Regions:
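Acidic, glycine-enriched catalytic cores built around paired aspartates
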Residues: 2-310
Length: 310
């Protein structure tokens, strides 16, 4: 229901690079249950109750002097953004530089809404135990599409998630609007967490933070390329050119050096063109209206120009 809000709570410029790579979970929100809980869920869906549970067994070390070591009933699936690991769920999308306060606010509010909905049903129930079983089965039936125990990095999962109707929000700029949807305003307003104005102000601040971060990165890249990389390459091409001339004067074959010179000169030309493009779009971005318009320009124009130069 609130996958877009969870994704937004973990959004920052650095996470745009991290999610889906570098030992990080993908940007698609799903839940990994593992074999043990998955077995319980399947029992509940098929019969309405769980009568047994899998266990992890013992670790066979082959050393008789060591005591028995119990194994987890499941692995930890590092490709899942929301995974059950032994006795808890882990929300792994938050970047290392970010505070967990924001994601905790979102998680706790979503859980509060779920508890409130359950209470509305159970408080009116004539038979509490029967109502609990029915409610659990209903929730699992309605939301089992978010359960995925496979490889979250695979292209197959991206296609499968699309079939299931799960959002794949790839960037911070595309995630921020989740804060100000009618659904989000109703959720946070119901529990007096944030007003509509407070959500809008937070969205505006996030847009500005994104724009500032990308602007700093772009200017740093321009500075590095213009003052360090290109001058170093120019110096090296001069050395290669001198070498080619010297080898030819000596009557030897200079084809290897000449080929290297041609390749590097070509790359230097491409680098200079990419640098000029980045300089132009960065300057253009500075003139855009601050907030959503500017941050979207940074994401869809400046970031690709940075990738081109990189």
């Amino acid at each position: 229901v609130h996958a877009d809000l969870l994704r937004e709570s973990a959004a920052d410029p650095g996470n745009d690079h991290r999610l889906g790579a570098n030992e990080a979970p993908p940007a698609i929100i799903s839940i990994f249950l593992g074999e043990q809980l998955q077995d319980v869920v399947e029992q509940l869906l098929s019969t309405g109750e769980a009568t047994h549970s899998l266990n992890g067994g013992k670790l066979q070390t082959g050393v008789t002097t060591l005591p028995d070591l119990t194994k987890d009933a499941t692995d930890r699936n590092r490709t899942s953004p929301f995974a059950f690991t032994g006795n808890k769920f882990e929300f792994r999308m938050v970047g290392s530089r970010d505070s967990i306060a924001g994601p905790n606010v979102v998680l706790n509010t979503i859980v509060a809404e779920a508890f409130a909905e359950a209470c509305d049903v159970l408080e009116k129930a004539d038979d509490f135990d029967t109502a609990v079983h029915s409610l659990i089965k209903e929730y699992l039936t309605d939301h089992q599409r978010i359960i995925f125990n496979g490889n979250g990095y695979s292209d197959e999962w991206v296609a499968e998630a699309e079939k299931r109707g799960l959002p794949n929000i790839k960037s911070m700029v595309e995630a921020i609007p989740a804060l100000t949807t009618d659904k989000a305003v109703e959720l946070f307003g119901k529990f007096s967490v944030f007003t509509k104005a407070e959500l809008e102000s937070r969205a505006e601040i996030k847009y500005e933070n994104y724009a500032k971060a990308i602007n700093i990165e772009a200017k740093a890249m321009i500075d590095i390329a213009a003052k360090q990389i290109i001058p170093a390459v120019v110096k090296y091409t001069k050395e290669l050119a001198d070498t080619v001339l010297a080898v030819k004067e000596a009557g030897a074959d200079a084809s290897v050096q000449a080929e290297m010179l041609a390749d590097i000169s070509g790359l230097l030309t491409e680098t200079k063109a990419a640098l000029k493009k980045l300089e132009a779009v960065t300057e253009e971005a500075a003139g855009k209206e601050e907030g959503k318009v500017q941050s979207e320009f940074y994401h869809f124009s400046v970031v690709p120009a940075m990738e081109g130069l990189r």
